Amino acid sequence: MIGAAGAVAAGAALTPVVFAATDSDSGSQPEASGTTPEEFPTTRSDAATGAGTATTAFAASYVGVRWAGARDGAALRLPDGDWRTLSGGCATVDDGGTALVAAGSTTSYEVKAADGTTDVRSLAIDTTDGPRRTFKVPSEPTRVRGVRYQSRPAWGADESKRYKNGVVNSPEKYYALQTITVHHSDTPNGDADPAATVRAIYEYHAVTLDWGDIGYHFLIDEAGTVYEGRYSGDDNVPAFNSDGDLVTAFHTSGYNSGNLGIALLGTLTDQGPTDAAKASLVRLIKVISRFKGLDPQAKVTFTNPVNGVTKDVETVSGHRDWLETDCPGQTMYDLLTEVRAAAAR
C-alpha cells in the first residue's frame, strides 16, 4: 500500500493502478485513452552466413554480427573503411561474441573471422527507409509513475519479430525483482533518430541473436526519452505483469531472471550520458526501487530463481559487474555511485 511519504511496502504488486499512473503523483487508475494511427518504416533485414563479403538489396544502417569462439574473434569492414575488430558489444552470449555496428547507408560489408572462430552470422538492418506501415499509438502520453515513456507501438515495434514459425520465440516468464543493471547500447552518440536505433537493436536481439525480443526492459536516449523494451503482456504495465513480477529479458547472460536492464543509447566509454539521460535514469531507478522496496545504495546477494546460482552485487550495478564486458562504458560506470545516491533520495 502507498504510505503518506509515497513509499510502498516491499514486494507490493505494481498493478496498472499503482505503477502506470498517468498523473505524476497520483496513484489513481489512468483514464482510458484512444489510439492514433502513426506510420513507421518497416524494418528490413538481410542475413548472411560465414566470413567474406555480403551485399544487400537496400542501404543498411546497422550490421549485426554473431560468432562462436573467442570474444575478439571477428572483424568487420565497410566500403572504403578500415577493418574494425569486433570485441563484443553490450549484448553477451554464452560462447563467442556479438556486435551491432553502425553502417551509415552501406549496401555491402565484409566480415573476417579469426582462427578458431566458427558459426559466423551477420544481419544487415535498415530501420529508416522500408515501406511504411501503420501502428496504433496511444493518443495520450504514457507514464511510469511520472516518468513519461514511449510504448512499444510508439517506437514502431513490429510484434511479429517475437514469433518464430508461428509461435512466440521466447514466452514470457516472470520473477520477483531483485536487482537493476545499467548498460550502454554501444551505438553512435549524437543519434539523430534514436527510435530507429531502438528498432535496430530490437531486430538485432530478436533475429540475429534469436532472443525473440529486445534484450532490455527500458532504453533511454540522449534527450532523456524512455522507451519500453521487452514485451511484458497486454496489461499496460511496462516490464512487469499485473502481479508485480518482472518479465525475464536478455541483457545479462545467466543472470536475467529477476534482473531489470536499462540501456542508455550511445557509447559511454570516453564520455558520460547527457544530463537529460542521466536524470531519466535516476528517476526511473528511483520509481522502480520505491515501488518494489529496493534500496538503490545497498548490496544484495542475487539468486537466480531458475537455477539457484548466486552472485553478490550492488542493487544497482553495471553490466561489467556480472560478466566480462566493457558495458556500460567506463565513464558511465564511474557515475553509478552518484546515480545510486540520487535514486535513493
Which residues does each PLM region occupy?
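Short, surface-exposed beta-strand/strand-loop-strand elements in extracellular ectodomains
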Residues: D72-G81
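Beta-sandwich interaction modules
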Residues: A51-A57, W83-G116
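Extended, low-complexity, turn-rich repeat/linker tracts enriched in Gly/Pro/Ser/Thr and Asp/Glu
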Residues: A68-G73, T117-D119, L209
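Active-site acidic/histidine clusters and adjacent loop/turn architecture
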Residues: K173-D210
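Carboxylate/His-rich catalytic cores and anion/metal-binding grooves
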Residues: G212-G215, V226
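A short beta-strand element within beta-rich, extracytoplasmic domains
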Residues: F58-A70
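Basic/polar, cationic surfaces and motifs that engage anionic cell-wall
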Residues: A5-G6, A10-R44, D115-I180, S185, ...
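N-terminal "leader" segments that precede or initiate the main folded domain
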Residues: M1-G11, A47-A51, A60
